[in-house]
């Protein structure tokens, strides 16, 4: 399962909630994400790696999926996907740019597209303070320009009460994993 959407849509919050609810579920694995950005906040789960080591791991084929966005590199270790053969559902906090690659490598893939209006994205991006002020408009343009379509895509509009949307994400994950 690939969870994607624009910056500020709330992917990390939804996945954090699902991770807490499904922590003891052996049929679900929340894949570790390696990022060339410092992990400064408590609500984002990733392993920090410098760009040189990331590039070496990428060249050695150590990532099952990887991509670049917003001046950073992101990767999911190849080993995270090994459990698919055992019937475990792997949940990846991914990018809209790798949906086709995930479909090709790890079919079938369910894609949860987390969205929110431009106004809400703008508000959240400013509130989290991770982006420079001038970067927010670029992220909003990217949000509008990258689309994901397909029979395997479920859109989750994340504008209302976090708990309601988080419960829906848990239901989707549970449905795929057979929990």
Predicted regions and their residues:
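ATP-binding Walker
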Residues: 9
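NTP-dependent small-molecule kinase module
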Residues: 123, 130-131, 148-179
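Conserved phosphate-donor/acceptor-positioning beta-strand/loop module used by diverse small-molecule
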Residues: 90-95, 105-126, 156
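P-loop (Walker A) phosphate-binding loop of NTP-binding proteins
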Residues: 6
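Walker A/P-loop
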Residues: 12
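Post-Walker A helix-loop "phosphate-sensing" segment adjacent to the P-loop in P-loop NTPases
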Residues: 20-30
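ATP-dependent small-molecule kinase phosphotransfer cores
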Residues: 33-90, 94-96
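Hydrophobic anchor at the beta1->P-loop junction of P-loop NTPases
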Residues: 3
């Amino acid at each position: 399962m690939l969870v994607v959407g624009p910056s500020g849509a709330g992917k990390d919050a939804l996945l954090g909630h699902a991770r807490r609810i499904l922590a003891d579920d052996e049929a679900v694995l929340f894949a570790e994400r390696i990022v060339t950005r410092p992990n400064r906040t408590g609500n984002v789960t990733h392993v920090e790696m410098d760009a040189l080591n990331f590039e070496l791991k990428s060249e050695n084929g150590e990532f099952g999926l990887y991509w670049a966005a917003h001046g950073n590199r992101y990767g999911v270790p190849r080993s995270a996907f090994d459990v698919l053969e055992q019937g475990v559902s792997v949940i990846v906090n991914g990018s809209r740019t790798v949906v086709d690659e995930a479909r090709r490598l790890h079919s079938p893939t369910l894609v949860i597209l987390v969205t929110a209006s431009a106004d809400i994205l703008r508000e959240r991006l400013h509130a989290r303070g991770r982006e420079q002020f001038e970067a927010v408009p670029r992220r909003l343009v990217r949000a509008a320009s990258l689309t994901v379509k397909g029979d395997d895509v479920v859109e989750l509009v994340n504008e209302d009460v976090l708990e309601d949307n988080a419960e829906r994400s848990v239901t989707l994950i549970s449905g795929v994993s057979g929990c």
